[in-house]
Regions:
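Surface loops and adjacent helix of pleckstrin homology
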Residues: 1, 10, 23, 103-104, ...
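Autoprocessing Asn-cyclization modules and mimics
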Residues: 10-12, 17-115
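Short, surface-exposed terminal/edge motifs of secreted or surface/virion proteins that either
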Residues: 2-22, 99, 148-154, 209, ...
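Short hydrophobic/aromatic-rich beta-strand motifs
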Residues: 1, 70-77, 131-132, 139-141
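Beta-propeller and closely related beta-pinwheel folds
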Residues: 115-138, 142-250
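Beta-propeller domains
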Residues: 2-6, 26-28, 72, 126, ...
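Short, solvent-exposed secondary-structure boundary motifs
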Residues: 1-2, 74-83, 182-185, 229
Length: 250
């Protein structure tokens, strides 16, 4: 993990065969749905090299429209509030209002200009996660340059899948779907490290240490809250676990 470059994984293919490859995240993670009046119009509902045209630049990348740093970024689009999302990955930028994308899950019917779209949370524009870990059969990541106190978790037992809901007209959210959570505090608490244990995930930030909790047995998209446990604050150094104790540098 590094905030300035996409996430990579190290693969062992044989006794002396190793490969470092970029992670191909599936369907996310995403920023909240567009709230501006700007619409997105795909030139087709399926295929590669499809133009994705904005009606304006307002509401996109701080009113800058498409940027060269959006290449590799995910897009979610739906025909309206009652239809399922499809998603795509930006492969090139033509102008501030036209991006070219490869569609991964088809959009519904014949696309029309709609405000119902979401942009990926991770990109050269928004930054990439600085840290990550595994907990409760999910891959967790945190702290981009634009969202320093946000965590993201993949779908359960699908470590590269950030699909936030089912691909159906109800956009059903199930317990094993991906999730994201932004720590609420009275000041910015950039996440420095994640330390998973047998029954808890400790989150070290610049202003304190936090624990995610749920009312049920496991954390789910609809059952999670992150509470502060201390106000010590953490240095940007990975902690060490000794039994059930987390040793970290302030």
């Amino acid at each position: 993990y590094h905030p300035d470059v996409p996430t990579y994984k190290l693969l062992r293919l044989g006794h002396a065969s190793w490969s470092l490859v970029e992670v191909a995240w599936e369907d996310g993670p995403y920023l909240p749905e567009n709230t501006s009046t700007t619409t997105l119009l795909p030139a087709a509902n399926t295929g590669l090299g499809i133009n994705m045209t904005l009606s304006a630049i307002a509401g996109v990348n701080d009113d800058q429209g498409w940027l060269a740093t959006d290449i590799g970024r995910c897009i979610r689009y739906a025909e309206g509030g009652s239809t399922a999302f499809g998603w795509a990955v930006i492969v090139s930028i033509t102008s501030t209002t036209v991006a070219v994308a490869d569609i991964k899950v088809d959009f519904n019917s014949s696309p029309t200009a709609q405000t119902t779209f979401r942009l990926g949370a991770w990109s050269g524009t928004t930054g990439y996660p600085s840290i990550g870990s595994f907990y409760e059969q999910r891959q967790w990541a945190a702290n981009t340059s634009t969202q320093p106190q946000t965590l993201w978790a993949t779908q359960t037992a699908d470590f590269e899948n950030h699909t936030p809901d089912k691909v159906d007209t109800a956009r059903t959210i199930e317990d094993d779907d991906a999730l994201d959570y932004t720590i609420s505090a009275d000041e910015v608490n950039a996440i420095r490290w994640l330390s998973p244990g047998e029954d808890t995930l400790v989150i070290g930030t610049t202003g304190g240490e936090w624990i995610p909790e749920s009312n049920g047995i496991v954390i789910t998209p609809s059952d999670v809250v992150i509470r502060r446990r201390t106000t010590l604050g953490s240095a940007n150094i990975q902690p060490v676990r000794v039994g059930n104790i987390v040793l970290f540098v302030q």
